[in-house]
Amino acid sequence: MANCAIVGINWGDEGKGRMVDLLTEDYDVVVRFQGGGNAGHTVINEKGKFALHLLPSGIFRSGVVNILGNGVALDPENLWTEMQDVMAKGVELTPENLKISDRASLLLPWHRDMDELEEMRLADKKYGSTKQGIAPFYSDKYQKKTILAGELFYSEELKTHLADLMEWKNLTLTKVYGAKPYTMAMLEEWLETYCEKIKPYICDTGIFLKDAQSNGKNILFEAQLGSLRDLDYGIYPYTTSSNTTAAYAPIGSGLPSAKIDDVVGVVKAYSTCVGEGPFVCEMFGNEAEELRKNGFEYGAKTGRPRRVGPVDIVATRFGVEAQAATTIALTKLDVLSYMDKIPVCTHYLLNGMQTDRFPFPSALKNAKPVIEYFDGWKCDISGARSWDDLPKAAQEYVTFIEKQIGCPIKYVSVGPERDSIVIR
């Protein structure tokens, strides 16, 4: 048995979904262990192009069991909508290949309202939320003010619990934000429309995972976002509200005894960021727009233009350490093929001193990038399938990043399709 975690090294949007889709050929189970509908894992295969938000990226592989673990922000409305979308494209989803932990907490209708209302209140001080209710959800979870998925099987207790939560939440909605209150009729409609649809998929996934582990099954843990958005290790407060690191995978999946054998850290060949907060190596103007256009850098969930810049060695090295990555997948190398000279942020200039260490979040606003330039290769590399197929300049770019971040780059993605990959 071998267990693997696929995690983001930077701000998210690195290409984790395409790597999960590729590597699930060797795994029996795929588990999403944190985050919620704010994710956007893009997968392109023979069935089309998919932007997965809650569903694990292993759903396209026959024989793979996909699990939403207890650490996930389980949004029944978004999940059921997403399930319908992928099933309409010929993807089979049954309780045999998709299982939802009965210990996952439900993202309730007012969580999205609270998210949007708080961003409106913050105005120009906003965090850049996707407005999917993630921060209010996790806040309520740690206050023990949510519903567990398993409670859907206990209707009377569920309605009493919901009524108590509604009374409490309506105080905040009406008194703090001046918004309309919820009614039980609204919540009962939500239960019927969405929760009843996902109910057949809810079970004790902890037992399933323990059995899988005992029987020598290979388990892949799929993370959302990246190291720099981790609640504890990221650029606080411009983080998500969950732990995005591989170390959290056993807890959030429901298999605390799991040993992670390999951690594949996914790094984009340049930097992108959605949302607010410090982004030291950010490009602006025409240079940024050209990179954004060539990489099609728009949020899979929000459609927002992503902030872009050169690969940031300082931030990436920090991300590798936070994830304890054992190997790296470098994605979207092909996007840089238009550049004559390729910029790389190798150090930061902070308080008149050059540093290669990622600083405390409060210091980042004063950091300036130190840029080196590498020769571009100026040719189409999307057909490369072996290391020798890549031009020398591309090889030098990859090996420089590898040396600087201190972790071997095993996979190099040269296109969005499943087979557009170089394995070293």
Predicted regions, residues:
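Non-transmembrane, aqueous-exposed alpha-helical and coiled segments at domain scale
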Residues: M1-R424
